[in-house]
Amino acid sequence: RCSTAYAVERTATETFSTNPSKIRKRLLLTDEMRLIMMFEDSFPSGGFIDCIDFLKPLERTSAAIDLLSLRKLRTMLDTLRKVTAFFSSVKDGVYPNLKRMSAGILSFPEIHRRIDNIIDRYGEVKDTASDELYNIRKSLREKEGAISPRMSAILKKA
């Protein structure tokens, strides 16, 4: 069963084949993945997110990404990193077809680093995401700090 709309779409485009080499290749890939799912605990089992819907609009120069989509992108990049690390760590000859297939995957470390500069590990926007945001949040904390003693004094008098 497919976990993303893209995967459903991709499998729907698969066609019947009578080509022996194509059939052999598909069977080898399927068997390697079956073995991974059965025996490899270090292979990621989640985090496969279809990002196309929110990445496509970012091709425009004035586009922006919302926080939820940024969280999803980070999750997908983490999963991608884990998948490539898994295949890099397996010995040559083990899962050779999937390993070869994963060799061309790009991990986009700069994008990952930029996301980590914007959101924390809980997916919340960091105060330091921008200088302007830092100043706004600092000002709010100072005002909250000034209001708190006044509220306490008013409540004590009441």
Residues covered by each model-derived region:
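Conserved amphipathic alpha-helical "coupling/scaffold" segments
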Residues: 1-140
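Extended, Lys/Arg-enriched charged tracts that mediate electrostatic binding to polyanionic substrates
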Residues: 135-158
